[in-house]
């Protein structure tokens, strides 16, 4: 098998589920990732990212005020 004709498939994935496949046809060629891929790997934030916009909006909303369920003291006068 000729090493120059070997096709190497590299899959680079980030946390957001972005997959990019690079096909390198020559063994001596250099892998140069795009600037978009580099910036996406540099800006990794800890935790789980929401998949949908509604989940992102709910995560950023302040907690809704829930009324207290404790019984209120009522004074009865005879």
UniProtKB/Swiss-Prot annotation:
Residues 58-78 are annotated as: Disordered. This is Uncharacterized 8.3 kDa protein. It comes from Vaccinia virus (strain Copenhagen) (VACV). The lineage of its organism: Viruses, Varidnaviria, Bamfordvirae, Nucleocytoviricota, Pokkesviricetes.
